[in-house]
Amino acid sequence: MLRELGRTATVKAHGRSVLRPVRGPAGRRQVAFTGVRPSVRVFAEAPAAEQAAKAIKLEDVKEGSEYEGTVTTVEEFGAFVNFGANTNGLVHISKLASGFTKNAKDVVQPGQKVTVKVLSVDAEKKRVSLELKSAVAAEASAEESDDIITEPDREGADATDDDEDVEVELEDGQVEVRADLPGFEDIPFVMEEADMDAEMSEAAIAALEADLDGAEIRYELEAPAYMEEVTGKVARIEDYGVFLEFEWNGKTLTGLLAKDEMKVPSSALSAEAQAALRAEWADTGFEMPAFVELPDDELDVKKYYQPGESVPAFVLESSLVDGRGISLTHFTDEEVSAEAVAAYEELEDDEDEELDKMMADAAGLEDEVLAFDPEALMEEDEGEEAGAAADAGDDAEYEGVSADGLEGANGNYALGATRSGLIKGKNGYQVAPMGLPSRPLNDAVTSSGLAILGTSEVDFDGDEVQLVDYWTSEAFDNIPKDVLKKLGLKMSYTEAGEAEFEERADFEATDVPFYLYGGDVESRAKEFVADLLSDDVDEAELPARAGRAPIVLAAAVQNISAAEVKALREKTGAGMMDCKKALAECAGDAEAAAEWLRKKGLSGADKKAGRIAAEGAVARYIHPGSRLGVLLEVNCETDFVAASEKFQALVNELGMIIAATDCICVSPEDVPEEVLAKEREVEMGKEDLANKPEAIRAKIVEGRLQKMRDQVALTNQATLSNPDKTVAELVKETIAAVGENVKIRRFIKYRLGEGLEKKANDFAAEVAQQTQAKAAAPAAPKKEEPKKEEPKKATVAVSAGTVKELRDKTGAGMMDCKKALAENENDMEKATEWLRMKGLAGADKKAGRIAAEGVVASYIHPGSRLGVLLEVNCETDFVAASEKFNELVNYIAMGIVAGQNVQYVSADEIPAEVFEREKQLEMARDDLKGKPDAIRAKIAEGRAKKIATEMCLLDQPFLTDPSKTVAEAIKESIAAIGEKISVRRFVKFQLGEGLEKKSNDFAAEVAAATGAK
């Protein structure tokens, strides 16, 4: 299935259409093209019968039988004959005549009536071998000619602007092709028969074998095509656009109508605005449009669109383009091109002298496409012949849709890679509505391939134009002479018709603009233009929609090197024209230009830094080994940017930078005052400053403190991807790239066992202590009373199988299991309880040990809006790496997220003032005012304790078993593992917690603006 191109494409082919490249007739204005045609028809030289006879089953065909049939095609090895069966039979060249036959075409012709005899039938493989018995004289269905069709002179073709229909005479081995588009059915194309070893499509094979007038294959496409009109209901409204749900081909699809691509209903405007608009359109003779464009500062998406409303739109992009779903627009290509060209025309004359000169040079090339790839001509190594250079373009790789993506056919369905172009037509320079191939395509084009060629297009002013066929034109036919001159090359043709290139003697190298002459125009121009547009109204930037016309936009910045403008834009986030002006003012010095922009207040990143950023992500980085962990929150303005690859890459790198450095705060201004006071005291007491005057000493200390601030601030750390760049610069570049304010809000770092005292074994001290204990005089023995003898329990026989069963159930030791069974007379349940009680008693003993090993772990809730970092300790790294321990840690982390009010590990950590504040709040409640003070105090204290319990992690229900608390679950793990386990600390970040989100009150803004006037 042709994926996500949007329409249902129909391909019809005849038996003679073993397809080769298409050549358009002369006398048509040529423009570039890319896209998918709804349908293409391929006609035969002689049409078949209007109604095919009922097919004979192969099982009914008997050897020796004779049939009348029609020759469908003639090959070197013989002829295919349709004799009424559902499979065409083959008459081998040796069976065409009684004598020797050199050429099958000398005996039979396509369409000729013949009588054949069946030699053999293979129903399983659907093969029938025939012998020619007799043949009716062939009718002259097509004129035979050995003349060579020559292409008209190129310059003459360019100067021709005649749109009259062209009569096309078919030669032997040719077919006629017409576009199945309303109004363009009369435009003919000539197709030549492929070589004998050319690969045939399934459609052509079906037609060859069945002699059908048209073998029709339909491809059901998954998404609407470019600029197809759809109407959907508003499903969701955001500040950056609306999501429309619409029905297409029986499916419900969702597309984003972005704010930059949006118009508003004229009916939603104020009465005054509607009256002015109606008066404006009254002079044109047309009705007032249903949708109108508003300036960005007046466009409030939520004001003009409501959920459930029906909204029409055009399809701008589908997932085939960039994998981001369906994008919608209210602007046609005509409007976009007009905006881009108008923006170029508004540039000052002295700013684009070089571009104007190029345009003037191109003006002499009537109807010529100005986007191509002549650098491919010079990619060969020196010393190679020019003829080899001519083949370089043909052998280049091209992108396409593989046969796996098609349904019902296995032919060659190559889609040529295409790019945008700037054309010169009747109405001046315009962006080509479609595009042209990056390189000529040498492969044979099949019937399916025709669906992407098409034959004609309509330019922005409704003029019909003929399409360039880059699949069959010679590699160098479409290179203007002035371009070769600019490149220092001269082209000529050898006697064999091969192109030769030689350098001009008087050539002087000049800076050739990259967008027009170098490399793949579309990819380079789009890459250059991608970040040039700014949504800041006060920067007077080119319109955002003009990004669909990258050639025109790229043209607007050619005086200054495009690479320099792009680099400065990425670094500062300033507008395109501002960057160009800054480089011009600073003689191309990028550093000076960046400083110039900053002083002028034109840095886009600096402007965006003032916006409220309450969206973003809570992320974590756990260093391998789980001994170091980081939890951080990075904010942006919208969840759309938060989910972008660029933003996520920034967050991930920040986490690793925090782990790798000694930073303790985000910026130098965030260093805690107590840390500065302590450092100031230390510096003032150093001996190297003792003999200096107080004022000088204070100044030196402040300088050292500032250096310390810079060292511990995250924004001043070097990035991992580029050590020459700081984190602050990386954030600024991200702001410029995503177009939103990005801010590092907070982070925290845990290092395992930090501040804990590990147990140290001093064996010498232990031996000395034991020696002193032995040397001490023994105390007088107490007189013990005789113990009462208890009757001995009868010995219980315990089987090995029972011991194994209990051991598997509890995990206890073998001797412990045996003793438990003996004590409980082989009762499995009682023995299990006995072991549990014994184990918990052991756990209480282990609680006094020092636990300085363990893990630093984290849990990020899906959506990256809530995250937890915690440290859980045990006694040995062996246990810390065990599966049971890590499973416990993960459940505890998820439990912290689940408990909304969890703030402390245990009740002992709750500050006294917090408990007292909660108690006073409860005392002041209305339901306790009528009670005596003593009773009220007791009730308030009970409620405060309950609140305190809700704040403590250890008192929360355990995630997997709410019948027990986290403390009880830890105690059971201690009994099972055999080491002390303790939750040392944790921290929880919730995205945007405490931040104020921006709310747009347009009524208040309008009132304020009116009052200001």
UniProtKB/Swiss-Prot annotation:
Output the InterPro entries linked to this UniProt entry.
EF-Ts_dimer_sf, NA-bd_OB-fold, S1_domain, Transl_elong_EFTs/EF1B, Transl_elong_EFTs/EF1B_dimer, Transl_elong_Ts_CS, UBA-like_sf
Q: Where in the cell is it found?
A: Plastid, Chloroplast
Query: What keywords are assigned to this protein?
Result: Chloroplast, Elongation factor, Plastid, Protein biosynthesis, Repeat, Transit peptide
Q: Name one GO cellular component term.
A: mitochondrion
Q: Pfam families of this UniProt entry? A: EF-Ts_N (PF25025), EF_TS (PF00889), S1 (PF00575)
SUPFAM superfamilies for the chain: Elongation factor Ts (EF-Ts), dimerisation domain, Nucleic acid-binding proteins, UBA-like
Give this protein's Gene Ontology molecular function annotations.
Answer: mRNA binding; translation elongation factor activity; translation elongation factor binding
Biased segments, Acidic residues type? 141-150
Q: Which region ranges are annotated with the description Disordered?
A: 141-163, 772-798
Extent of Basic and acidic residues compositional bias: 781-793
Q: What's the chief localization of this chain? A: plastid
Q: Name the Gene Ontology biological process terms.
A: mitochondrial translational elongation; response to light stimulus
Q: Which residues form the S1 motif domain?
A: 64-133, 227-331
**Range of the transit peptide:** 1-43
> What name does this protein carry?
Polyprotein of EF-Ts, chloroplastic
What gene, per UniProt, encodes this protein? Answer: PETs
